Protein backbone atom coordinates (compact mmCIF):
# COMPACT_ATOMS: atom_id res chain seq x y z
CA UNK A 1 0.00 0.00 0.00
CA UNK A 2 1.54 3.34 -1.00
CA UNK A 3 2.19 5.83 1.79
CA UNK A 4 -0.51 8.45 2.28
CA UNK A 5 2.07 11.05 3.21
CA UNK A 6 5.80 11.69 2.85
CA UNK A 7 8.23 12.71 5.57
CA UNK A 8 10.85 15.32 4.87
CA UNK A 9 13.18 17.75 6.62
CA UNK A 10 13.07 21.42 5.72
CA UNK A 11 15.89 23.59 6.98
CA UNK A 12 19.12 25.42 6.26
CA UNK A 13 22.73 24.57 6.93
CA UNK A 14 25.33 27.15 7.90
CA UNK A 15 28.67 26.92 6.15
CA UNK A 16 31.20 24.83 8.05
CA UNK A 17 28.67 23.51 10.57
CA UNK A 18 27.15 20.07 11.02
CA UNK A 19 23.46 20.07 10.20
CA UNK A 20 20.76 18.55 12.39
CA UNK A 21 19.19 17.35 9.17
CA UNK A 22 22.20 15.08 8.61
CA UNK A 23 21.02 12.90 11.51
CA UNK A 24 18.06 11.72 9.40
CA UNK A 25 19.53 10.43 6.12
CA UNK A 26 16.42 8.30 5.49
CA UNK A 27 14.33 11.46 5.04
CA UNK A 28 14.46 13.69 2.00
CA UNK A 29 16.08 17.04 2.78
CA UNK A 30 14.69 20.24 1.27
CA UNK A 31 17.10 23.14 1.69
CA UNK A 32 15.06 26.26 2.34
CA UNK A 33 17.86 28.71 2.94
CA UNK A 34 17.88 30.85 6.05
CA UNK A 35 14.42 32.14 6.90
CA UNK A 36 14.26 35.46 8.73
CA UNK A 37 10.76 34.80 10.03
CA UNK A 38 11.51 31.99 12.49
CA UNK A 39 14.97 30.69 13.41
CA UNK A 40 15.49 27.73 15.74
CA UNK A 41 18.53 29.46 17.26
CA UNK A 42 16.40 32.46 18.26
CA UNK A 43 13.87 30.17 19.93
CA UNK A 44 16.58 28.25 21.83
CA UNK A 45 18.25 31.39 23.13
CA UNK A 46 14.97 32.95 24.23
CA UNK A 47 13.78 29.66 25.75
CA UNK A 48 16.79 29.15 28.02
CA UNK A 49 17.52 32.81 28.81
CA UNK A 50 15.26 33.70 31.74
CA UNK A 51 15.77 37.40 31.07
CA UNK A 52 14.19 36.95 27.63
CA UNK A 53 11.00 35.21 28.73
CA UNK A 54 8.95 37.84 26.92
CA UNK A 55 10.77 37.14 23.65
CA UNK A 56 10.09 33.43 24.01
CA UNK A 57 6.39 33.99 24.69
CA UNK A 58 6.21 35.97 21.45
CA UNK A 59 8.19 33.44 19.40
CA UNK A 60 6.30 30.45 20.79
CA UNK A 61 3.10 31.76 19.22
CA UNK A 62 4.59 30.85 15.83
CA UNK A 63 5.23 27.23 16.84
CA UNK A 64 2.86 24.32 16.20
CA UNK A 65 0.60 23.98 19.23
CA UNK A 66 1.86 20.50 20.29
CA UNK A 67 5.47 21.75 20.19
CA UNK A 68 4.64 24.86 22.23
CA UNK A 69 2.73 22.77 24.78
CA UNK A 70 5.63 20.34 25.16
CA UNK A 71 8.10 23.19 25.70
CA UNK A 72 5.82 24.82 28.28
CA UNK A 73 5.61 21.58 30.27
CA UNK A 74 9.35 21.01 30.01
CA UNK A 75 10.03 24.57 31.22
CA UNK A 76 8.53 23.61 34.60
CA UNK A 77 10.89 20.63 35.02
CA UNK A 78 14.05 20.28 37.09
CA UNK A 79 15.98 19.37 33.95
CA UNK A 80 15.04 22.69 32.36
CA UNK A 81 16.20 24.56 35.48
CA UNK A 82 19.57 22.82 35.23
CA UNK A 83 19.95 23.58 31.53
CA UNK A 84 18.88 27.20 31.99
CA UNK A 85 21.44 27.67 34.77
CA UNK A 86 24.13 26.11 32.58
CA UNK A 87 23.11 28.39 29.70
CA UNK A 88 23.46 31.48 31.90
CA UNK A 89 26.93 30.35 33.01
CA UNK A 90 28.11 29.78 29.44
CA UNK A 91 26.83 33.18 28.30
CA UNK A 92 28.57 34.93 31.22
CA UNK A 93 31.77 32.97 30.55
CA UNK A 94 31.84 34.00 26.91
CA UNK A 95 31.11 37.62 27.77
CA UNK A 96 34.08 37.64 30.14
CA UNK A 97 36.36 37.03 27.13
CA UNK A 98 34.54 39.40 24.77
CA UNK A 99 37.18 42.15 25.09
CA UNK A 100 40.13 39.85 24.37
CA UNK A 101 42.04 40.99 21.24
CA UNK A 102 41.62 37.52 19.73
CA UNK A 103 39.12 34.70 20.30
CA UNK A 104 40.62 32.63 23.14
CA UNK A 105 41.86 29.07 22.77
CA UNK A 106 41.91 27.07 25.99
CA UNK A 107 44.36 24.22 26.63
CA UNK A 108 43.27 21.49 29.03
CA UNK A 109 44.28 17.99 30.12
CA UNK A 110 42.22 14.89 30.95
CA UNK A 111 43.25 11.58 32.49
CA UNK A 112 41.80 8.18 31.61
CA UNK A 113 42.88 6.03 34.56
CA UNK A 114 42.28 2.27 34.30
CA UNK A 115 42.78 -0.17 37.19
CA UNK A 116 41.55 -3.78 37.37
CA UNK A 117 38.68 -3.30 34.93
CA UNK A 118 37.61 0.02 36.48
CA UNK A 119 37.88 3.64 35.37
CA UNK A 120 38.37 6.62 37.67
CA UNK A 121 35.70 9.34 37.34
CA UNK A 122 34.92 12.55 39.18
CA UNK A 123 31.61 14.36 39.57
CA UNK A 124 31.79 18.04 38.67
CA UNK A 125 31.12 20.39 41.55
CA UNK A 126 30.03 23.43 39.53
CA UNK A 127 29.27 24.71 36.05
CA UNK A 128 29.88 23.87 33.33
CA UNK A 129 28.55 20.33 33.64
CA UNK A 130 27.56 20.60 37.29
CA UNK A 131 26.60 17.17 38.60
CA UNK A 132 27.91 15.29 35.56
CA UNK A 133 30.62 12.67 35.69
CA UNK A 134 33.89 13.52 34.00
CA UNK A 135 37.52 12.60 33.61
CA UNK A 136 39.89 14.14 36.15
CA UNK A 137 41.47 17.14 34.47
CA UNK A 138 41.58 20.88 34.06
CA UNK A 139 43.47 23.81 32.62
CA UNK A 140 47.21 23.81 32.01
CA UNK A 141 49.09 26.36 34.11
CA UNK A 142 51.30 28.91 32.38
CA UNK A 143 54.52 27.46 33.78
CA UNK A 144 54.02 23.70 33.39
CA UNK A 145 54.29 21.03 30.75
CA UNK A 146 51.28 19.14 29.44
CA UNK A 147 52.07 15.78 31.05
CA UNK A 148 52.85 17.42 34.39
CA UNK A 149 49.52 19.25 34.27
CA UNK A 150 47.65 15.97 33.72
CA UNK A 151 49.32 14.34 36.72
CA UNK A 152 48.79 17.42 38.90
CA UNK A 153 45.09 17.72 38.07
CA UNK A 154 44.60 13.97 38.55
CA UNK A 155 46.07 14.04 42.04
CA UNK A 156 44.36 17.31 43.01
CA UNK A 157 40.87 16.21 42.02
CA UNK A 158 40.97 12.62 43.28
CA UNK A 159 43.60 12.48 46.04
CA UNK A 160 44.82 9.33 44.31
CA UNK A 161 47.48 7.82 46.58
CA UNK A 162 49.91 6.95 43.81
CA UNK A 163 53.27 8.79 43.63
CA UNK A 164 53.73 11.14 40.68
CA UNK A 165 56.72 9.16 39.29
CA UNK A 166 54.64 5.97 39.31
CA UNK A 167 51.81 7.77 37.50
CA UNK A 168 54.26 9.08 34.90
CA UNK A 169 55.53 5.55 34.33
CA UNK A 170 51.97 4.26 33.96
CA UNK A 171 51.14 6.40 30.91
CA UNK A 172 50.46 4.09 27.99
CA UNK A 173 49.08 6.46 25.38
CA UNK A 174 48.01 10.04 24.73
CA UNK A 175 45.99 11.93 22.17
CA UNK A 176 44.88 15.47 21.40
CA UNK A 177 41.13 16.03 21.05
CA UNK A 178 40.62 19.28 19.18
CA UNK A 179 37.22 19.40 17.51
CA UNK A 180 36.40 23.14 17.30
CA UNK A 181 32.94 22.63 18.87
CA UNK A 182 33.73 20.03 21.52
CA UNK A 183 33.07 22.52 24.33
CA UNK A 184 30.35 25.15 24.71
CA UNK A 185 32.83 27.35 26.59
CA UNK A 186 34.70 28.05 23.37
CA UNK A 187 37.69 26.63 21.51
CA UNK A 188 39.07 24.06 23.95
CA UNK A 189 41.88 21.69 23.01
CA UNK A 190 42.47 18.86 25.47
CA UNK A 191 45.46 16.56 25.80
CA UNK A 192 44.24 13.23 27.14
CA UNK A 193 46.44 10.55 28.71
CA UNK A 194 45.79 6.87 29.32
CA UNK A 195 47.11 5.62 32.67
CA UNK A 196 47.11 1.86 33.26
CA UNK A 197 47.74 1.13 36.94
CA UNK A 198 49.03 -2.34 37.79
CA UNK A 199 47.11 -4.40 40.39
CA UNK A 200 48.93 -4.57 43.73
CA UNK A 201 46.84 -7.09 45.63
CA UNK A 202 45.48 -4.29 47.83
CA UNK A 203 42.42 -3.58 45.71
CA UNK A 204 41.52 -0.26 44.14
CA UNK A 205 43.42 2.77 45.50
CA UNK A 206 41.34 5.03 47.73
CA UNK A 207 40.12 8.25 46.11
CA UNK A 208 38.25 11.32 47.28
CA UNK A 209 36.78 14.18 45.28
CA UNK A 210 38.37 17.57 45.99
CA UNK A 211 39.01 20.88 44.24
CA UNK A 212 36.60 21.07 41.24
CA UNK A 213 35.14 17.62 41.99
CA UNK A 214 32.64 16.88 44.76
CA UNK A 215 33.09 13.12 44.37
CA UNK A 216 35.55 10.63 42.89
CA UNK A 217 34.93 6.93 42.37
CA UNK A 218 36.06 3.84 40.53
CA UNK A 219 33.45 2.68 38.02
CA UNK A 220 33.44 -0.82 36.46
CA UNK A 221 34.03 -0.50 32.73
CA UNK A 222 30.87 -2.44 31.89
CA UNK A 223 28.86 0.04 33.96
CA UNK A 224 30.65 3.00 32.38
CA UNK A 225 29.36 1.95 28.96
CA UNK A 226 25.81 2.67 30.17
CA UNK A 227 26.67 6.19 31.39
CA UNK A 228 26.89 8.10 28.11
CA UNK A 229 24.14 10.57 29.07
CA UNK A 230 25.80 11.20 32.45
CA UNK A 231 29.22 12.21 31.08
CA UNK A 232 30.50 15.75 30.57
CA UNK A 233 31.06 17.05 27.03
CA UNK A 234 32.85 14.41 24.90
CA UNK A 235 34.45 12.47 27.75
CA UNK A 236 32.50 9.29 27.01
CA UNK A 237 33.98 9.19 23.50
CA UNK A 238 37.46 10.12 24.70
CA UNK A 239 37.43 7.11 27.02
CA UNK A 240 36.17 4.76 24.34
CA UNK A 241 38.86 5.89 21.93
CA UNK A 242 41.49 4.83 24.48
CA UNK A 243 39.69 1.60 25.33
CA UNK A 244 39.99 0.69 21.68
CA UNK A 245 43.77 0.98 22.05
CA UNK A 246 44.06 -1.23 25.17
Give the positions of each predicted feature:
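Short, flexible loop segments at boundaries between secondary-structure elements
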Residues: 27-52
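N-terminal Rossmann-like or analogous alpha/beta NTP/dinucleotide-binding catalytic cores
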Residues: 1-28, 36
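Unchanged
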Residues: 139-243
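A conserved beta-turn-beta hairpin within the catalytic core of GNAT-like acetyltransferases
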Residues: 127-131
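Acidic, metal-coordinating catalytic segment for phosphate/diphosphate chemistry
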Residues: 67-110
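Segments forming glycine/polar-rich beta-alpha architectures that bind adenosine-containing cofactors
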Residues: 121-124
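A polyampholytic, Gly/Pro-enriched intrinsically disordered region
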Residues: 46-66
Amino acid sequence: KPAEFRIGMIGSQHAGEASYCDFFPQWHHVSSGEQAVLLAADIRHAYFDRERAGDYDRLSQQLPQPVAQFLDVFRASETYATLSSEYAYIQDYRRSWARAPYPPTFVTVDSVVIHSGHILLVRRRSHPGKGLWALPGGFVDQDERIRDAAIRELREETRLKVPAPVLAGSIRSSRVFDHPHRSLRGRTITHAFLFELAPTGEGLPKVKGTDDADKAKWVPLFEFQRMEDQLFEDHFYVVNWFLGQV
